[in-house]
Regions:
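Active-site and substrate-binding clefts of carbohydrate-active enzymes
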Residues: 2-30, 34, 192-196, 200-203, ...
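Short, conserved catalytic/metal-binding motifs centered on acidic residues
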Residues: 136-139, 237
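A generic structural signal for short
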Residues: 135-136, 256
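Catalytic alpha-helical scaffold of carbohydrate-active enzymes acting on polysaccharides/glycoconjugates
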Residues: 1-134, 141-197, 214-231, 261-276, ...
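Short, solvent-exposed loop/turn segments at secondary-structure boundaries
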Residues: 69, 104-107, 211, 248-252, ...
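C-terminal accessory segments of proteins
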Residues: 205-217
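Residue-level detector of flexible, active-site-proximal loop/helix-junction positions
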Residues: 98, 165, 203-205, 286
Length: 393
């Protein structure tokens, strides 16, 4: 069989950071804008030279697509729109609020996913780009088993989770080791009788661990030729779109010959001449490739420091705003309302992972102030509603 090595490049776009502020410079989101513009420019150049590379984008909606990019970099939105139409780029779901999906109630989770697709403010992926794949690349790769049924109810085809060689991972260390054939193909995850597809996903660390993307692709293909792998494989590299990994370092010779130093241009060029390589997207690959393995785990996953939730849960500040969140939820429940409660939208916005971490031991002061404002406001709204209800009765 003429098995192929499919390669996809995923850009995780969130311009609202826990460790940087809200200014259009390197102390805020200026680096995001610079690097994303360069990614689009380099991808376009490659396509114009006949290289059929495709990008996969997962945008956060509330802050990036709704506020920051329209004001400071509308050309990025236009550039991705053009690439979707002209070169087959794909948009997948992150979550409306770059939210901690695994920490949400059913109603909060549903809103985060549904509003990411389309919403009244016009910042949904379908609103902006005209289409999206019902595949979720959750913010910080946060996933909780009990939400499989919710993903299925919402028509989600698959979830992308890190299966990484470094402790910035999701599920590699909590299941038996997968063979390369299965590790680079979709797998079926099952929890309490409910199943969904998980797409193993990789970072720049996995590329560096292999030596280079070319080395990784050639190693997998050699196993295809030897019969160790009897299927196509898909290397899906997904990293923050502001990562320097995507940007050429422009090093002088001979340093510029070192692998992984020429950004997205180098990552594409080093495999573009391999006849067994096909450029693809998660949605494109899943259309023609079924899961090859069944996996089970019962832990929550996240890609924080040393893999896990400590980056978002262990600071005293985290406990303060989480207590307020639970208080607002309790008031809403007492009022026999959740998605219709006065605090609901504020709760969804507070549940942005950025209001909890990844930064440690403290967040950017602008981010802390925003989280404190939101959390205080949601409680006050619920208290006011409770007082109003008592007066009516």
């Amino acid at each position: 069989m003429d098995y192929k090595v499919h390669i996809g490049y995923g850009f995780h776009v969130n311009c609202y950071h826990s460790y940087r502020g809200d200014t259009n410079d390197e102390l805020g989101f200026g680096g995001d804008i610079r690097i994303i513009r360069k990614i689009i420019e380099l991808l376009n150049n490659l396509n114009e030279k006949g290289v059929p590379v495709k990008g996969t984008w997962d945008f956060e909606n509330a802050y990036s697509l709704e506020e920051i990019l329209p004001q400071y970099a509308p050309d990025i939105i236009t550039g991705v729109k053009d690439r979707v139409k002209k070169y087959g780029d794909e948009n997948i779901i992150m979550g409306y609020n770059n939210g901690a999906l695994s920490a949400m109630t059913k109603e909060e989770f549903t809103a985060s996913i549904e509003w990411a697709v389309t919403n009244s403010k016009g910042s949904g992926l379908e609103d902006v780009f005209g289409e999206c794949e019902k595949i979720v690349r959750p913010q910080e790769f946060m996933f909780t088993p009990s939400q499989v049924s919710l993903y299925n109810e919402l028509g989600i085809k698959a979830v992308c989770l890190y299966y990484s060689c470094v402790p910035f991972d999701a599920f590699r260390t909590i299941i038996p080791q997968l063979s390369d054939e299965k590790a680079f193909n979709p797998v079926t995850y099952t929890y309490k009788g409910e199943s969904m597809v998980v797409l193993p996903t990789y970072s720049n660390c996995d590329v560096i661990d292999a030596g280079s993307l070319r080395c990784l692709a050639m190693d997998l293909h050699s196993k295809q030729l030897s019969g160790e792998i009897n299927n196509d494989v898909f290397i899906f590299i997904n990293m923050d779109a502001d990562a320097n990994f995507w940007e050429p370092f422009n090093l002088p010779f001979p340093l510029n010959r070192i692998a992984n130093t020429d950004g997205i241009r180098g990552l594409v060029n080093e495999v573009a001449d391999l006849e067994f390589v096909e450029f693809n997207t998660p949605g494109g690959y899943l259309k023609n490739h079924k899961p090859l393995a069944d996996i089970v785990f019962t832990q929550d996953t996240a890609d924080g420091s040393f893999t896990g939730y400590s980056s978002w849960a262990e600071k005293p500040f985290n406990r303060q705003i989480w207590t307020r969140l639970e208080r607002a939820r309790a008031y809403a429940k007492a009022g026999k309302s959740d998605s219709g409660s006065p605090s609901f939208e504020d709760r969804v916005m507070l549940l942005s992972t950025t209001h909890f971490g990844l930064a440690s031991p403290m967040l950017n002061v602008q981010r802390e102030n925003r989280a404190l404002e939101l959390s205080e406001r949601m409680v006050q709204k619920e208290l006011a509603a409770q007082k109003g209800n008592r007066q009516l009765t």
